[in-house]
Amino acid sequence: YTGRSMDGAEAERWGFYNKLCEPGKLAADAKALAHSIAAGPTFAHGMTKRCIHQEWSMGIDDAIEAEAQAQAICMQTKDYERAYKAFVAKQKPVFEGD
């Protein structure tokens, strides 16, 4: 709103970017991020994306309820069970999307 310029490092601190990339490394860094997301809990990622889109038009109470329902659904998946067991065993979970 002020028209003040900021450099990339400050913009990253403000949360405008996930990461600053070194010159020439953007494609490699983007592929690594995509791989990391794809290896994660894809069902839960989909639920999160759905909630983000739906909650733009909700009040806070409805958004909190939607989040609670999404969590309850995600907690019924096999990926949740894998994540829980891996957490207890202090291991990294391997997600399968179910």
Residue ranges and their predicted role:
Residues 37, 51-55, 70-75:
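Helix-loop "lid/cap" segments that line or gate small-molecule binding pockets
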Residues 59-64:
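Short beta-strand->loop
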Residues 24, 58, 74:
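Charge-dense, low-complexity intrinsically disordered segments
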Residues 10-12, 67, 71:
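Acidic-residue sensor for enzyme active/binding pockets
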Residues 1-45, 77, 82, 89, ...:
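Crotonase-fold acyl-CoA enzyme core
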Residues 56, 92-98:
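Short C-terminal tail/terminal secondary-structure segment
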